[in-house]
Every structure is written in structure tokens, then in C-alpha cells.
């Protein structure tokens, strides 16, 4: 199902169309690079919609479903960027921090309820994807192979790990 998840109604429509899932992998997102006062505001608003609001809506709707049957796993793809400030990528780093903090908070709620529903966060460094082209950024460190990161993430998710940090 191809949908623009920056549009809130599409997130809700996706949830209506796709039910009874055991796994939710929230992996939509993009970044942008540049001085905060010079980056494009409309692009940043779209980034916030994709990187925060879509994650929030999908996590909430599917978590409600999963809690009803007391099973399921949610993997929110964040970034190591979620743990630190990010000059020249301020909005992106802030969105990933939101994903980390939301996931940590939900994890604590699930723990207190003794729920069998699991939430985890994948926090990779640079990965060899189209992200760099969209974000107008070039990393000066080796990028991880996307297949290896995905395989690592699924393995750790199935083992019940919360923080999944490749490398």
C-alpha cells in the first residue's frame, strides 16, 4: 500500500485497511541539512508530520489493537541522532528524539501493566540508503549496509531487546 504518511488521514486510512498485525515497523522518515534559520520551513513541517505525527498515530492505533489481544511488537526506527543535539540537522535530530522518548514512555507503561506487547527502538548511525540524497548531507563515516541493519534489528526485536543499536 503506497501512501504519503505525512498526511494524517492516510495514517488513519492505513490502520483501517491493515488490521490484525503482529508486527508494526515504523520506518517512514527523512531529514534535511543546513543552518536552522536557512532550511525550508515547509520541508521541516513535512518532516515533522512524517517523522513524528505519522509515528505517533500508527503507534497509538496499532498499540490499542495489540493491547486488546495482549500480543504484538512495535519497532520504531529512530536514530542515534535521537540521543544528542544535531547542529545543521536540528529538526531531524529533534524528531528522532521524540521517537526515542515516546517509545521509552510507552515501554514503561507496558511494563507497569505487565503487558506482553513489546515496543523497541532501532537507533542506527548512518545507513546506506537514499536518505543522504534527500537530506542533502554527506557523512564522513562509513555507512552501514541497510540489509545488515534490518537483519540485526529483526533479530534483536525477536529477542525482546528495547534499544537496538547496530555497530
Model-predicted regions and their roles:
Residues 59, 95:
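Active-site helix of classical SDR
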